[in-house]
Curated annotation (Swiss-Prot):
Major place of residence: secreted
Keyword Cell membrane assigned: no
Protein name, UniProt field: Turripeptide OL55-like
Cellular localisation: Secreted
Keywords recorded for this protein, A-Z: Disulfide bond, Ion channel impairing toxin, Neurotoxin, Secreted, Toxin
Length: 103
């Protein structure tokens, strides 16, 4: 569902990247993929479930990242740098292929 300042999401969702998405830590909504969660938050699955929760937060804190293999990108996400093993999201412009962040 699209959103902006004049078309807000319902109160249990957050407007992120002009889409109504599940906020970090929500107990109201289940996610099926990381695309269901706000930008920078990953869907975590437990015990083989087909649905999960948006509980892995990779957003920058005060413009910085704590992991030296990541850096804060223009979306304010701590993304893994080129060539790094992708244990979470890759930096904007990179994708995880064969276990590493690549252009």
């Amino acid at each position: 569902e699209a959103c902006d300042d004049s078309h807000p999401c319902n109160k249990t969702l957050a407007c992120s990247g002009n889409k109504c998405l599940i906020p970090y830590g929500s107990t109201v909504w289940d996610c099926e993929s990381g695309f269901d969660c706000v930008i920078g938050v990953v869907c975590t699955y437990h015990g083989g479930d087909k649905v999960g929760r948006c509980t892995q937060d990779h957003r920058c804190q005060r413009g910085a990242c704590t992991n030296p293999a990541t850096e804060c990108d223009e979306d304010e996400v701590c993304g893994y740098k080129e060539g790094e093993t992708c244990y979470g999201p890759c930096r904007k412009g990179l994708t995880c292929r064969l276990g590493r962040c690549r252009p």
